[in-house]
Design a protein with these regions (language model features):
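Active-site neighborhood of HAD-like aspartate-dependent phosphohydrolases
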Residues: 1-42
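A metal-dependent, Asp-based hydrolase signature
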Residues: 46-82
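Short, surface-exposed acidic
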Residues: 30-38, 71-82, 165
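Hydrophobic side chains within well-formed alpha-helices
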Residues: 20, 33-34, 80, 131-134
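Short, acidic loop-to-helix structural element flanking the phosphoryl-transfer center
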Residues: 58-59, 76-113, 123, 151
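An amphipathic alpha-helix signature
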Residues: 21, 34, 38, 58-66, ...
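Asp-based, Mg2+/Mn2+-dependent phosphohydrolase catalytic module
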Residues: 1-3, 8, 102-105, 114, ...
Length: 224
């Protein structure tokens, strides 16, 4: 199916988390705690969605940090948490993102950002990273009252764009995001940046690549 509107996840997919990874090493002593935190954040957001808890990305991110610190007997001060989370607003794009996005834009593909970050945070991220001219729209799940991978988010994004959900494709570096989008009827592209495991029980992505340039080429080839 030809798809001329592509949605992009932001944290780790579009923006480089190297500064965040360094903070985790400084606080927790090992980079593996970053993925542990991501897993706990996903768990908390999923529980919040199912039980209809009204919360924000920032609140969940802070709680997830405190939780993994507590479980691993690591003392973490509130100012250290604030310092770590503030770095999300000043992340730079991954090296392959700009040429990959340019390739799509030059071929009349509409590109949009769709993130679990708050509306305020994602706008700060896109502005600081210099990506304003690369996304036609920037969408936070905050306006839908849920979090990815809830199907509601993907359906709501399609409705907001006045597009059939089947005409959209989601690009993400996280298997749960790709699976969530495809469960809702979108196409899915897995940008496997860090040799991450893709759950075999999830819907197989339409496209998989370890860099954005080749992934963009694959999207264009599917549209021919």
């Amino acid at each position: 199916m030809k798809r001329d509107t592509i949605l992009f996840d932001i944290n780790e997919t579009t923006l480089d988390l190297a500064p965040i990874r360094s903070e985790f090493i400084s606080i927790f002593g090992h980079k593996s705690f970053l993925q542990l935190w991501f897993s706990q954040l996903l768990h908390l957001s999923t529980v919040s969605t199912i039980t209809k808890i009204n919360t924000t990305f920032l609140e969940l991110a802070k709680t997830a940090l405190e939780d993994i610190a507590h479980k691993n007997n690591i003392e973490i001060k509130s100012n250290a948490i604030d310092s770590l989370l503030s770095k999300f607003a000043t992340l730079k794009p991954c090296d392959d993102m700009l040429p990959g996005l340019e390739l799509l834009k030059n071929n009349n593909i509409r590109t949009l950002a769709l993130s679990n970050s708050s509306n305020q945070l994602i706008k700060s991220q896109i502005k600081y990273s210099g990506l304003l001219g690369y996304f036609d729209e920037v969408i936070s799940v905050e306006e839908f009252g849920s979090f990815k991978p809830d199907e509601k988010v993907y359906f709501s994004a399609a409705k907001r764009l006045k597009k059939d959900v089947n005409s959209l494709m989601m690009v993400a570096a996280h298997d749960w995001d790709v699976h969530g989008a495809m469960s809702a009827g979108m196409g899915g592209a897995f940008l496997n940046r860090n040799s991450l495991y893709y759950n075999p029980n999830f819907i197989k992505p339409d496209i998989e690549s370890d860099n954005m340039i080749s992934l963009s080429k694959a999207i264009l080839e599917r549209n021919e």
